[in-house]
Every structure is written in structure tokens, then in C-alpha cells.
């Protein structure tokens, strides 16, 4: 899956569909889920002290089927390889477990100047 992500983004760059390079510094967004807002805020504060940018929480709105799950988003500008991203994901799954969160919900990537 991560190998495919890198391969697809490299192809998009070659095709001129994106201007940024997944092999360079990127804005990596990491997501966590839980039903307890305070627990997510505390986890976000811990991650902020570790160098992540606390982007915010996304709470359910009327259009969401799941009215209980809240999402935490933290970002970090850094360069990853397939192996380093796999290691980061493993680290964040452990972090979610240690914080008592429902789950680490994965990541997204974009250019450094992305919102």
C-alpha cells in the first residue's frame, strides 16, 4: 500500500499532474480517532511537544453516518521513504494505543505549503 502510494505520486509528478515531489520534503498529515474529545486534545498536545503541528479536530456533522467519532489531525513537514513512513506508521499505532485512543487512522501527504 505505501509502496503504491509513492509509485502513484511519482507517476503524477512525471505526468505533470502535481508540482511537488513525494521524495522531497512534504506536509504529512496524520489522523487519530476517538469518541473522547479531551483524550484527542491531550494526544495532540503530546504530539505537538514532539514536533508535530496540531491542526485540529473534526467533529461529526449532520451528514456523517457516525455521530460519535472525532478525528484529530496533526501535520509534520518532513521527508520520507517507503521504509521510514512504514516505521512512522508503526510508531503512531503504538502511540494511539498508549494514549488509549480508538485508533491511528492513517496519513495523507501534500506539498509543504498545503493547508
Describe each region flagged by the PLM.
Residues 1-115:
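Long, contiguous binding/interaction regions
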